[in-house]
Structures are given as structure tokens and as C-alpha cells.
Amino acid sequence: MEAASRRQAILDRLRTADRPVSASALAAGLNVSRQIIVGDIALLRAGGAEISATPRGYVLPRATDGITRTIACRHTLAQTGQELDILVDNGCTVLDVIVEHPVYGQLTGQLQISSRYDVEQFLARIRDSDAAPLSMLTGGLHLHTLCCPN
């Protein structure tokens, strides 16, 4: 498969996916290395494709029938799961987390969390990586972009 057709196949797969697609899954489906996919994604982005990287893989923005809003939140690390569960239990998808850093300015982490399973996976990644959520940089103060049904 030539590079141009492979990149088109990547875009097609991302357009039809209902979940983030990992570079490894794309590589296996296209019979190339993960590194080739990462390079293709970079070239697609440079060409204007709005591909976002989440902790679970790549996504394209979707047109939604719902409402997209940004909310401000403040909580402790221990309350992170409770916050996310409340949001997804009410039908919201948590698209990202945003903090205002005094040196770097606005930092955004892509989340794409829409179910309790996604919440569990996110919390497990935090525990397993021994990394702190972005909100801990600002004493728990952060923003979330939500997509909610009408």
C-alpha cells in the first residue's frame, strides 16, 4: 500500500470509529509498524487533519447533536473518580481537562471519557504510571470541556 492510500485508510478508520484507535491497532490493520503510523499521523496533522491524541488512541472531532460547554471544577485527587462518574452517569462525554499554568499558560489533556469503564481505565493509568492529573498542578482547579445530550 502506498503512503497516500495508507493515510487515507487511517482517516477512514478514524472517521468510522466510535472509540479512540491506537497506533498499534492502526499498524496491525495496515500491516505496517507503529512508528510508520505515528509518522503518518504527524503528516496528516501537518496537512490540516484535526486528529487528536488521547491516552487510548487517536480521534477525529465529531459533529454532535448535543451541547458542548466548558465547566470549572475543583476537587482533591481522591475525588477525581467521583467527579468523572457524576459526569458520565448524566450522559456527558468529558472531552478534555484544561489547567492554567503560570509558566506554560493553558495546558490541555485530551480525555474522551464517556463511561464508567473509561473512568476506571483513566484512573488505572494514573495509578500505574504514578503520574498526577493535570489538575494537581493548580491545587485541584481545572476546566473540563463536556459534550452533553440535549
What are these regions (language model features)?
Residues 1-29:
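Extreme N-terminal segment that seeds HTH/winged-HTH DNA-binding domains in transcriptional regulators
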Residues 35:
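Key DNA-contact positions within bacterial/archaeal DNA-binding proteins
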Residues 51-62:
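Minor-groove-contacting beta-hairpin "wing" of winged helix-turn-helix DNA-binding domains
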